[in-house]
Amino acid sequence: MSRLDVTEKIITAKVMKGLKWADVAAKLNLSKEWVTAACLGQMTLNAEQAKIIAEIFDLSDEDQKWLMVTPCKGSLPTAVPTDPLIYRFYEMINVYGTTIKQLIHEEFGDGIMSAIDFKMDLQRVADPMGDRVNIVLNGKFLPYKQF
């Protein structure tokens, strides 16, 4: 048994039960973005949260314990992603990554955007030419320090 096995059980149960991530998140009173990441194995749940997730997805006590183990974050394969949606993010960073970096440094100075002190919001935006995806990534700026 591994955390990946628990993730697969969660995805299977979600499909079989016809659940939406937003509905799961509402039961935890947390964002759909964070709860989805947690259910997919990228965040650590506390005991109370793990119990709720275990109840929603009919997980065992052993599975529930795996939800509370600190994950190996960013554990996607290191090769270029082949899933079309994930690849588009890879492509966006390849095309716009240096631009984003330059604009952040120009605005804030030398540093990084935190993925720890971080929020994400994903919304559908109606458009007569076809609905659009609006993703806001909100991370604390962390300047490099001199020593």
From Swiss-Prot:
GO terms for biological process: cyanate metabolic process. CDD domains: Cyanase_C (cd00559). Keywords: Lyase. InterPro entries: Cyanase, Cyanate_lyase_C, Cyanate_lyase_C_sf, CYNS_N, Lambda_DNA-bd_dom_sf. The keyword Lyase applies. Its EC number is 4.2.1.104. It catalyses: cyanate + hydrogencarbonate + 3 H(+) = NH4(+) + 2 CO2. One of its GO terms (molecular function) is DNA binding. The active site is at residues 88, 91, 114. Disulfide bonds: none annotated. Pfam families: Cyanate_lyase (PF02560), CYNS_N (PF21291). It is an enzyme of class 4 (lyase). HAMAP family: Cyanate_hydrat (MF_00535). Belongs to the cyanase family. Catalyzes the reaction of cyanate with bicarbonate to produce ammonia and carbon dioxide. This is Cyanate hydratase. It comes from Methylobacillus flagellatus (strain ATCC 51484 / DSM 6875 / VKM B-1610 / KT). The gene is cynS.
